[in-house]
Swiss-Prot record:
The keyword Nucleotide-binding does not apply. Belongs to the major facilitator superfamily. Sugar transporter (TC 2.A.1.1) family. This is H(+)/hexose cotransporter 3. It comes from Parachlorella kessleri. The keyword Magnesium does not apply. Residues 42-86, 136-137, 195-204, 323-328, 374-394, 455-456 are extracellular. Its main location: membrane. The chain crosses the membrane at residues 21-41, 87-107, 114-135, 138-158, 174-194, 205-225, 300-322, 329-349, 353-373, 395-415, 434-454, 457-477.
Length: 534
């Protein structure tokens, strides 16, 4: 929602006018909403582990099983190069991409709570019913598609909701709660896969338990308050004010509420169709490009290639199935711990610093992994990796995961949720999530084929992209730490590069921002006079 310090013309800081802080109530609201991240996390974590279980492979992917048992001779790099297996992994993201088109309309017209509830229902139906009882690949893919609809809705609305309910000084911390629960979902999935690895049809339980995070999101949608921004936008101003006061723990919310009202007055005349069209004008192009490119960069760190395929990767390198699944648990634990670091650091050091530092860490780790595999495993991998080398590869992957988890992971969700204006926010966040799912689909569909074709070079490929990401973060990304989201567009209008992209609209935005500040101050003055008279 609103929040933070940005210096307006004349040098006046707005942050001192925002009252209230981090209350127990807003913490509880953010905690329940952030649980929606477990939908995406559990699915990401469970997929690769299930794909490495022999019972699952024999039933759905016998070609892969024969390669693993060396019934069919092949390079270890190519063991899992199977189009149907890749479709099983990536089909969810194609469905999620499509669902984002509808989720923006639902979020703007029915509210944030409705989007969360519908997403939870899709996840319960798909995880609890279709995938758990799948009899063939077709049924498995149908379940994945339904899961994709649920993940698409949850991923679009939860970060947006968290940004709208969070106080300015803790927006980064609370929004990263979504990514934290993504990592918790990944860890839980790894533990479940490891626990049922020797059970008959244990893979059914692994897939079926996806219904649990869906149920949590559905229940959360019932008990959570609606976003004050949405209520004001729908004309329920008094209710929006009451919820804002409860979230902030004070009745003195004049400045923040005035900013919301001013933003709504600009957004209200704009229809959903106009919102989508506006995104592609020069006025909003900087935010659109930022959010979309961040999603591209997030996936081309190689993160989902690692998360999806950690068990598969270590199986390919010679680890037994149980050891490969245990490695997944280790990676998941590192992921959770490092994301907790991001929760503490994002509002202290800012978004750009974490992206730059994390990008450098990930790049060095990818280089180390590629060089180690190139030297020890070679192009053909005729022998299993020695245990010390395998442990070294695991350590390097954990360093990569740590660097990603406090940078490109949480920032990939936080930044798009806080840079769009109210009138374009549902459509803008939908485009960001669509980009995430599009590139997740590409990586999920292509990684094992890339591993087969490029061998250890696939890690060097991702390292090259990480260099580009760091440079873009240094030169092209404005720092949004402490900036009220109603005023981020003015930040872009003053940026050395993005003001050129905006063209004449940049000066219009700056003038509108100054006018909005003046209007907010006038409303505050009237309310103070009114309270004094009472």
């Amino acid at each position: 929602m609103a929040g933070g310090a940005i210096v307006a013309s004349g040098g006046a800081s707005r942050s001192s006018e925002y009252q209230g802080g981090l209350t127990a109530y807003v913490l509880l609201v953010a905690l329940v909403a952030a649980c929606g991240g477990m939908l995406l996390g559990y699915d990401n974590g469970v997929t690769g582990g299930v794909a490495s279980m022999e019972q699952f492979e024999r039933k759905f992917f016998p070609d892969v099983y024969e390669k693993k048992q060396q019934i069919v001779e092949t390079s270890p790099y190519c063991t899992y190069d199977n189009p149907k297996l890749q479709l099983f992994v990536s089909s969810l993201f194609l469905a999620g991409l499509i669902s984002c088109i509808f989720s923006a309309w639902i979020t703007r017209n029915w509210g944030r709570k409705a989007s969360m509830g519908i997403g939870g229902i899709f996840f319960i139906a798909a995880g609890g019913l279709v995938n758990a009882f799948a009899q063939d690949i077709a049924m498995l893919i149908v379940g994945r598609v339904l899961l994709g609809f649920g993940v698409g809705l949850g991923s679009q609305v939860v970060p947006q909701y968290l940004s709208e309910v969070a106080p300015f000084s803790h927006r980064g911390m609370l929004n990263i709660g979504y990514q934290l629960f993504v990592t918790i979902g990944i860890l839980i999935a790894g533990l479940v896969n490891y626990g049922v690895r020797n059970w008959d049809n244990g893979w059914r339980l692994s897939l079926g338990l996806a219904a649990v995070p869906g149920l949590i999101l559905l229940l959360g949608a019932i008990v959570l308050p609606e976003s004050p921004n949405f209520l004001v936008e729908k004309g329920r101003t008094d209710q929006g004010r009451r919820i804002l006061e409860k979230l902030r723990g004070t009745s003195h919310v004049e400045a923040e509420f005035a900013d919301i009202v001013a933003a709504v007055e600009i957004a209200r005349p704009i229809t959903m169709r106009q919102s989508w069209r506006s995104l592609f004008t020069r006025r909003y192009m900087p935010q659109l490009l930022t959010s979309f490119v961040i999603q591209f960069f997030q996936q081309f760190t190689g993160i989902n290639a690692i998360i999806f395929y950690v068990p598969v990767l270590f199986s390919s390198l010679g680890s037994a199935s149980s050891a490969a699944l245990l490695n997944t648990v280790v990676v998941g634990a590192v992921n959770v711990g490092s994301t907790m670091i991001a929760v503490l650091l994002s509002d202290k050091f800012g978004r750009r610093f974490l992206l730059i530092e994390g990008g450098i860490t990930c790049c060095l780790a990818m280089l180390a992994a590629g060089i180690t595999l190139g030297v020890e495993f070679g192009q053909y991998g005729t022998e299993d990796l020695p245990h010390p080398v395998s442990a070294g590869v695991l350590a390097v992957i954990c360093i990569f995961i740590a660097g990603f988890a406090w940078s490109w992971g949480p920032m990939g969700w936080l930044i798009p949720s806080e840079i769009f204006t109210l009138e374009t926010r549902p459509a803008g966040t939908a485009v960001a999530v669509m980009g995430n799912f599009l590139f997740s689909f590409v990586i999920g569909q292509a990684f094992v084929s890339m591993l087969c074709a490029m061998k250890f070079g696939v890690f060097l490929f991702f390292a090259g992209w990480l260099v580009i990401m760091v440079l873009c973060a240094i030169f092209l990304l404005p720092e949004t730490k402490g900036v009220p989201i109603e005023r981020v567009q003015a930040l872009y209008a003053r940026h050395w590069f993005w003001k050129k992209v905006m063209g004449p609209a940049a000066q219009e935005i700056i003038a509108e921002d100054e006018k909005r500040v003046a209007a907010s101050q006038a409303i505050m003055k009237e309310e103070r006079i009114s309270q004094t008279m009472k």
